[in-house]
Regions:
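Small/aliphatic-rich secondary-structure junction motif
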Residues: 1-50, 59-68
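Short secondary-structure boundary segments
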Residues: 35-36, 93, 97-99, 128-129
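Glycine-rich, Arg-bearing micro-motifs that act as flexible, cationic patches
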Residues: 96-119
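Conserved acidic residues
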Residues: 1, 92, 121
Length: 131
C-alpha cells in the first residue's frame, strides 16, 4: 500500500506533503507525490518546475521515505489525477491540503478537494496550512 499526496508549491501543498511524510513514516509505506497541470497555459504556478523538483527530491531524500514523484500535463483536473494515481498504486490514504474559499468561489470554480473526497476509493486526510 502507498500514501498518495496531491502536491502544489503553496502553503497548503507544503502542509499536505508534511502530513503525508508523517503518515508514510508511521505506516512504513512509500509516498506517491502527484503534481499535475492541465496544460492550458504556458506558466502554471501549481506545476513544480525543474528547480522545485530538485529541491523536493532533496527534502524527500533526507526524509528516508521511499517516494515517487508523478508529474503530468495532460488536460485533466488535479482531482482526477490524484484519484487515478491512488487507484493505480492501491493507496491506503490520500493526503490533500485545503485553502479557505468563499461560497461564491466554490460555486464558480468547483472544489478539487471536494471531488477527491467524493471520488476516492480510500480514506482522505485533509489538512490546512498554518496561518
Amino acid at each position: 500500500m502507498t500514501i498518495v499526496v496531491g502536491y502544489v508549491p503553496t502553503p497548503e501543498g507544503e502542509a499536505a506533503l508534511t502530513a503525508a511524510l508523517a503518515e508514510a513514516r508511521l505506516r512504513e509505506q512509500p509516498l506517491h507525490i502527484v503534481n499535475s497541470a492541465r496544460g492550458d497555459s504556458l506558466i502554471d504556478s501549481r506545476f513544480v518546475q525543474e528547480r522545485g523538483v530538485e529541491e523536493l527530491r532533496t527534502r524527500l531524500d533526507a526524509s528516508g521515505v521511499v517516494y515517487e514523484i508523478d508529474q503530468k500535463v495532460r488536460g485533466h483536473e488535479a482531482s482526477e489525477e490524484v484519484v487515478e494515481a491512488a487507484d493505480r498504486v492501491n493507496a491506503s490514504l490520500i493526503v490533500i491540503g485545503l485553502r479557505r474559499r468563499t461560497p461564491t468561489g466554490k460555486l464558480i470554480t468547483g472544489s478539487q478537494a471536494q471531488r477527491i473526497l467524493l471520488d476516492a476509493n480510500c480514506p482522505v486526510l485533509a489538512v490546512k496550512a498554518d496561518t
